[in-house]
Swiss-Prot record:
Tissues showing expression: Expressed by the venom gland.
Positions carrying Threonine amide: 17
Name assigned to this protein: Cupiennin-7a
Keyword Signal assigned: no
Species: Cupiennius salei
Length: 17
């Protein structure tokens, strides 16, 4: 799912400082 992927990527980017 694109939405799921975007959500995961968003979370990953947020965790990446």
């Amino acid at each position: 799912d694109l939405l799921t992927t975007i959500k995961r990527v968003k979370e990953s980017m947020k965790r990446r400082t």
